Structure formats: C-alpha cells, structure tokens
Amino acid sequence: MKVLIPILIGLLVVGCGKKTSKPEAKTTSPSTSPAQEANNTQPKTNQNHKTGENPEPQKVMFDWSKVDSQPERAKHIARELRVWRSLNPKKEGKKLRVVYFHPKDRLPLKNYEERWDRIMADIQQFYREQMRQLGYGEITLSLEQERGKLKLHKVEGSANDDGSYSYKSGEPIRREVFRALAKDGIDANAETLLIVCGLSRTEGKRVTIYSPYYGMGANHNRGICFVADSDWLTIDGLKPDKKKIALQVKEHRGYESFSLARFNTTYIGGTIHELGHGLSLPHNHATIQESKRGTALMGAGNYTYRQEWRKEGKGSFLTHAHAIRLLVHPVFSGTTQQCNQSPNLKLRELKVSFEGDMIHVRGKIQSDVPTIAMIAYNDRGDRGQKGYQVNNDYDATTWTSVISPTKEFWIRVGDLKGGSHQLRLISVHANGAAITHRLHYTMKGGIPDFKRTRTEVSKIITP
C-alpha cells in the first residue's frame, strides 16, 4: 500500500541560536514546532444552514507535548503501526535461524542442544521483558522450534580442527553454512542467521576460544552473526555460584581469570549483543536518563548481561531507539508485509538549530512505506579516531521522535559534549526498512558550529 502525501516545497534552515540557561517552557509554540506551521485538517463538519455549503475545514495543530515522554511516544508509534497493518492482509513473519557449526573431525560440544535451547529462550525472554517495559507489549524475536525445542541447523565444516578455523574465519564459515542451508531449501541470503561455532577447547577449567565473534552486513531482510560455544556456557552459570568456580580463559590475549558468572555474562551477553548486529542494530550508549536502567545492550551491555540476577549491578537494557527498530523487524513483528518494498524516503524539509542547551532537528518527510519514527544517533569522534561507526560508535547516544499526522518530526538531542560529531538521522519504516542520512557538526565552548551541517542539509533536501 502506498501512502500518498502532498509534495511540498522543501524548506532549508540551519541556524544556531544563542545559548540559553534552560529549554523553552512551551514545546508546542508555533515558532518552534514545524508541525504547527503545516497544519493538518479534520473531516468536514455540518453544512452551513444558510448557504447549504460545507464550511472551511478546521485546522488542528499537533500537540508535541503529548508525545514528550518515552511511554507516550511508544503509545503513538504502536497505534500508527496497528493502523497500517490493519489495511493489508497479514503475511507470515520470519524466524531466527540458529546454526551450529563444528569442524569435520570434532563433534558439537557436550549438551549443546539443551544448553542452547535454554540460552535462546532466555534471550527471547530478555527481549520480551524490555519491549513490555517500553510499552510495546509481549513482543519478542521468533525462534524456529522442532518438537518443542530450539531447532538447530547442524553444519559440519569441510576442514579439521587443526588451525584451519580461527577468529578470522567468518567468511569461509559463512560460505559453508550457506551451501549447507541451500541443500535444505533455505535461501540464507533472505534470512537472519545466528551461527554458533563449536570452536573452543576446554581442559578442566582452562578454556581457549578461537571462534569468529562478530556480526556482518545486515538489514531487516537478512543478517548474520557469529558467536562461540563452550562447555561452560549455560544459563545456570549466570546465577550466583556457591562453588566459586574460577576459569582461565584465553581468546585474543593470554589466559585471564574469570568467575563462572562473569564468563557466562560475557559470552551469553556477547551472543545477544552480536545478535543485535545481525538484526541490523549498531552500537549505542545510554543517555544520562536511560543509564538509570543499566547499561545499553548495544553498548557495553555484553559485559553486564543478567548481572541483576546476582545483585552485581543493574544489568543490561534495550534503548527505546533500538526497540523501535526491532518492533518492525520481520523476526519480531510477525509479518513480512511489504518487506521488500523500498520506502522511497524524501526529506522535504529539514532544520537544525540550537535551543535551550539541546540540538533540535525538525523536518518533514514523504515515503511510500509509512515512517513510524525518526532516530538520531549523536556520535562523538574521539581523539585519533578515523571515521564513525563500526566500533567507533559505542558512545553514540540515541534520541527519538514520532511522526505527526502531517509527516513531521522533531528530535531533541541532549547530553551534548565538546568535539566533532556525526549526527545520523535514521527513518524507521513500518516494513522494517531504515534509511540513514548523515550530518556533522562541532561543539566548542558549549555552542555548536553548524557550518558543515548547512552544506550537508542542502544536499539532503528533496524539493
């Protein structure tokens, strides 16, 4: 279904106001909200009794103050998504494919089926808990089941465990997995895959891991990530350990001491973190407000997963920005409705300004597939850093906006710091697609410089 939206002439304004001591009190002022400059209309009312003609439609302003909090935004987004899905017949969603890879001369590690059934059930429960807390209900990732248990696609490698496979073996393992799945009639290029590699050795309490451990190119239609298995990896290992088991673990460096709990937090937490990449989530960092909930899963959350079970910290959490992206991913949404259609996004208006110690990004969009939210990743460039994203984005905070009835958004970016920044604007669409536009600015003395931003905005706007 195409959403027909009137084409308006693009408005380009990038400005920097003077720094003020506090944000403006009224967030719905016509002078600050683009939604109030382009009003939507209500259906026609009763006829004029004297002329028999319908009166002029009443103009209604979108009240941004009603979506000022995270729960209010979630309610708005969920409602808009339900409306879109109700307009078309539901198409079955996708399920995460979990693959277990092992070398030719080695069997899978002991109890791998039972252990990974429980690990994935817990990861599924984590997502369910987080989506519920954020106001999206009982939403979680879908897993393939076989006789009531997790379905694992077992793939035997073509090489022996003689050094042929290592951390750098992601691409050759990917090719072997794709060939094996093709024999079962599965097009891996159209799936989201979690590849668990039985590439570790355990000698008592000494563990050596030499598995690929990262995600590769992903979008809402496909994705792939690699994680490691170990005999010591188990959900029970996340709980308080009365035996105080200490492991010696070697992965990239020499052997390092790990408690059993820390080992499982790191590697089960690493599994859900890398799975996030396989689901197309980049890194991000908790805002000051969000940090009250713990550590962002896609930041350093792989090192804090389920710490709350042991009362060692607040644990990991899912940011609202990433919950929005998962909400429409076919592995979560339960539908592939229009998943192969390009959103054909156009930014008709875009304005970046500095008001009340926050960067305000306002704009108006047009798209063939409804846009349910806009997200800004505010990514600071550290000293000596080359480029942004891909392991340089752990400090990127995320900020969200709903889309008004007149297809406008208003993102307010806070927690500002000095230095050079990349501001990535992501449009999230109802079919799971996400479109990225990049802006850059520098911050010095508490004031942003939008000189480069101004040039970039002029290239983004579609008249």
Identify the residue ranges that each predicted region occupies.
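Sec-dependent signal peptide recognition
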Residues: M1-I9
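C-terminal motif of bacterial Sec signal peptides marking the signal peptidase cleavage site
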Residues: V14-G15
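Short, low-complexity, disordered segments immediately C-terminal to signal peptides
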Residues: T20-N46
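Propeptide-to-catalytic entry region of secreted or membrane-anchored zinc metalloproteases
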Residues: K50-A218, R383, G387-V402, H429-A433, ...
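Active-site scaffold of zinc-dependent metalloenzymes
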Residues: V207-A261, Y303
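Active-site recognition of the HExxH zinc-binding catalytic motif
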Residues: T266-P282
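Short beta-strand elements
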Residues: N431-P463
